[in-house]
Amino acid sequence: MRHYEIVFIVHPDQSEQVPAMIDRYKATLAAVGGKIHRMEDWGRRQMAYMIDKLAKAHYVCMNIECDQKTLEELEHAFKFNDAVLRHLIIKTKKAETEPSIMMKEVQHEEARKSAQSDAPVAAA
C-alpha cells in the first residue's frame, strides 16, 4: 500500500456536514484495510483566490495509506460531491503523523483567542 496526503476544500455553507463526510471517507478506507495516519480539520479559512464567488471555505487534510483502487474510489467520491469545491491528492514516501504547519497555526490562533477572552477587560 502507498501513502497519500489528501486536502479537500468544502463549501462554507456545508461546514456542518464535514464530520459526516470525514466519517464516510474513513468508512471507505476501513472497509478495504486502509489506514488513516493523520486527520486534521483546519476549519473555515480564507482562500488564496475566489472559487464560485466564495472567499472562504472549510479545509480538511488527511494522511492515509491505501491501495490504488481505494484511492480511485475516494477521488470519485470527491468529484461527485457538490459540497467539495477542490481536492488535491499527493503521493508521499512515508506516513506523516505529526501535526502539519497549518494545524500548528490553527492551534496557535485558538490559543491566542482563548487567552484574549480570558484576559480581564480594562476599565475605560
UniProtKB/Swiss-Prot annotation:
Disulfide bonds: none annotated. Keywords: Ribonucleoprotein, Ribosomal protein, RNA-binding, rRNA-binding. SUPFAM superfamilies: Ribosomal protein S6. Gene3D superfamilies: 3.30.70.60. It holds the Pfam family Ribosomal_S6. GO terms for biological process: translation. The keyword rRNA-binding applies. It comes from the Bacteria. Residues 105-124 are annotated as: Disordered. One of its GO terms (molecular function) is structural constituent of ribosome. The keyword Glycoprotein does not apply. One of its GO terms (cellular component) is cytosolic small ribosomal subunit. Belongs to the bacterial ribosomal protein bS6 family. NCBIfam families: S6. Binds together with bS18 to 16S ribosomal RNA. This is Small ribosomal subunit protein bS6. The lineage of its organism: Bacteria, Pseudomonadati, Pseudomonadota, Betaproteobacteria, Burkholderiales.
